[in-house]
Amino acid sequence: MSGRGKGGKGLGKGGAKRHRRVLRDNIQGITKPAIRRLARRGGVKRISGLIYEETRGVLKVFLENVIRDAVTYTEHAKRKTVTAMDVVYALKRQGRTLYGFGG
């Protein structure tokens, strides 16, 4: 054993990150047709032009909250990989229980 503790094989010494890509404006990757498809699935017939930016904003806030909670669960378990169960628990904590992904 190399003294790295539990689950420490092959993870290196954990030195400084060399490159961290700056992520910005990725919310525009949620395209107008994608939002339209979601609305159609929800039974919407006509969509105002202002809806697309509003939807992106709401989706961004929702995902930030879920991901923050999921990462908190991951860190508490001393893992580096966010699992499906972390996301399920994060959604449950927010009152949006999701079935079909274990647990």
Swiss-Prot record:
Gly residues bias: start-end ranges = 1-14
Task: List N-acetylserine occurrences by residue.
Answer: 2
Query: Where in or outside the cell?
Result: Nucleus; Chromosome
Region of interest (Disordered), ranges: 1-20
Top-rank taxon, per record: Eukaryota
**Keyword vocabulary terms for this entry:** Acetylation, Chromosome, DNA-binding, Methylation, Nucleosome core, Nucleus
Molecular function (Gene Ontology), one example: DNA binding
Q: Which SMART domains match?
A: H4 (SM00417), TAF (SM00803)
According to its record, what are the GO cellular component terms?
Answer: nucleosome; nucleus
Q: Which residues carry this modification: N6-acetyllysine?
A: 17
Residue intervals annotated as DNA-binding region are: 17-21
Give residues where N6-acetyl-N6-methyllysine occurs: 6, 13
Partners and quaternary state? The nucleosome is a histone octamer containing two molecules each of H2A, H2B, H3 and H4 assembled in one H3-H4 heterotetramer and two H2A-H2B heterodimers. The octamer wraps approximately 147 bp of DNA.
Function as written in the Swiss-Prot or TrEMBL entry: Core component of nucleosome. Nucleosomes wrap and compact DNA into chromatin, limiting DNA accessibility to the cellular machineries which require DNA as a template. Histones thereby play a central role in transcription regulation, DNA repair, DNA replication and chromosomal stability. DNA accessibility is regulated via a complex set of post-translational modifications of histones, also called histone code, and nucleosome remodeling.
Protein family per UniProt: Belongs to the histone H4 family.
Q: What is this protein called?
A: Histone H4
Q: What is the lineage of its organism?
A: Eukaryota, Metazoa, Spiralia, Lophotrochozoa, Mollusca
